[in-house]
Amino acid sequence: MEYGLIGEKLGHSFSKIIHEMIADYIYELKEIAKDDLDSFMKSKDFKCINVTIPYKKAVLPYLDFISEEAKKIGCVNTIINKDGKLYGYNTDYYGLKLLIEKQNVNLENKNVLVLGTGGTSLTAKAVLKDLGVSKIYQASRKSEDGLISYSDIYNYDINYIVNTTPVGMYPNNLDKLIEVSKFKNLLGLTDVIYNPLNTNLVLDGIELGIKADGGLYMLIAQAVYAIKLFKNIEIPNLKIDEVYNKLLKEKQNIVLIGMPSCGKSTIAKELEKRLNKAVYDSDTEVERIINTTISNFIKSNGETNFRNIESSVIENLSKQNSLIISTGGGVILRKENMFNLKQNGLIIFIDRPLELLTPTSSRPLTSNKFDLKKKYNERIDLYKKYADIIVKNDSNVDDTIEEIIRRLD
């Protein structure tokens, strides 16, 4: 291996895509078991590598040189082999600092809560100190001096939170350590996790109306700084934004919500051609599981059982990337569905006026005009609440598709 990333589990990593977007080398992902780290590091069979969980501190004894920022932090994420001598750096510092600065949240003299005690927590504390925070509280499940327990965190006046733990990371997307709504003076938060793009922690912050971001921007920024070191070249910071926007657009799911007969399925098929993303219809996936029509299933088993299966389908689809997901009309009735869809998705409400919607027997909950109107009135505010983009579909469907493409660009 010449260039690459080492870690224990790398199935979720975007690093190969990012490095190969920017640099002219092949970037490999190499999973290394803890028992094999010693032989790998002693062999020095690489040119330049990045290091991730759980080896950011474990590699320190193998290094011949450690940069000043890495010494201050106490861990590295970047190693360069120069004629058999190993040089260690910490580019996570620059990535996290740029992400927080991008939020325009003034942390000077503020109280910050850091979740976790691993290598990234050391980076976070170094960044926060340099941003002039007043006090850093560090939460852990361990009982040690200088740490506070998760049961005690709500007793402190916290203004900002940084999650450095893997809690909420794919495939355990639903996991969450804390309830941000319990902090009354919270200005913002950062979760270093980038898969999913928005963890439930981030979504909770967004719902509260505070600045809240996942770790994708940090990941790209630290990669740019690593590439500068790898190749001894200058790369403008504008490149970070360029790659971020491109990768976000590539990885993000497009999720269509709206009433039955609003045009979601037709629009999804056309978007598939334009966006080069695979289409999944949640109703079709449900019927694949129940082995009958949704109409028959609801008549025999009731709506609640149908909604439970639908939620399971939504959870599984939401964990994937680069999809177009056409949802059933009632998907917005459960907040958990919408939080799952928002983790990796951009929600587009296909807003078709009630008078243009068509009741059909294949949709048991909206099979006549009376029920259709009733459901429309029950759901319209929820569609608008969860939508990132609202697009009218009241004339030519081609115009609707063009409007979606325009809004995505």
Where are the regions a protein language model picked out?
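Glycine-rich adenosine-cofactor-binding loop
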Residues: 7, 90-93, 100, 109-129, ...
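NTP-dependent small-molecule kinase module
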Residues: 241-249, 270, 274, 346, ...
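Adenosine-phosphate binding glycine-rich loop
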Residues: 192-252, 393
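A glycine- and Lys/Arg-enriched "phosphate-lid" helix/loop adjacent to the NTP-binding pocket
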Residues: 344-382
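NAD(P)-binding Rossmann-fold cofactor-contacting core
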Residues: 131-147, 285-290
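ATP-dependent small-molecule kinase phosphotransfer cores
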Residues: 284-339
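Rossmann-like adenosine-cofactor binding region
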Residues: 146-212, 331-337
